[in-house]
Amino acid sequence: MYLARTRFLFFLASLACASIIGVAFYLQQAVGLDPCTLCMVQRAAFIACGVLALCAACHAPGPTGTRRYSLGLLLVALAGLAGAGTQVWLQTASADQLIPFITRLEQILSLLSLDMCIDRLRSDALFCAEITWTLFGISLPEWSLLAFTGLALLPLYPLFSELSHWLATRDRGGY
């Protein structure tokens, strides 16, 4: 029963990611909301989460494979969570907080010899800081933050249920 539950959870996660990407493309095409750089990063993370979850649902792996898929989904969801969190911070930060952030990021990019990214960063950081659309008073990056939080919590169920199962069998002398 455990594997059937995790397979269903992975399928739900892939369905949620596909729905989110569909809504994002609808908002871009029908409403005219152009995505910024951080929005594109979040879209890539949603696509990666969806593909990974769909592969896990179709593959129906054993306990070891479920752990691996769960860990991969957790890492990708945490990366998306970082991108969405950064965009939410950019939207709530004041101008005096944005300038040192952009300056520090420019220094890091120049150390990495990514000077061509600096001009794009300057314009995109200000573009990402704009709140262009809300639903129920919540902006799109905040919705993404909520979705990535759910996607990060979802793989914890298989990971911790496996851990509790392992601890229970170890206490009985099963291993």
Swiss-Prot record:
Disulfide bonds join 36-39. The chain crosses the membrane at residues 10-26, 45-61, 69-85, 143-161. One of its GO terms (cellular component) is plasma membrane. Residues 1-9, 62-68, 162-175 are cytoplasmic. The keyword Secreted does not apply. Residues 27-44, 86-142 are periplasmic. Keywords: Cell inner membrane, Cell membrane, Chaperone, Disulfide bond, Electron transport, Membrane, Oxidoreductase, Redox-active center, Transmembrane, Transmembrane helix, Transport. GO terms for molecular function: electron transfer activity; protein-disulfide reductase activity. InterPro entries: DiS_bond_form_DsbB/BdbC, Disulphide_bond_form_DsbB, DsbB, DsbB-like_sf. Pfam families: DsbB. Required for disulfide bond formation in some periplasmic proteins. Acts by oxidizing the DsbA protein. HAMAP family: DsbB (MF_00286). Belongs to the DsbB family. This is Disulfide bond formation protein B 2.
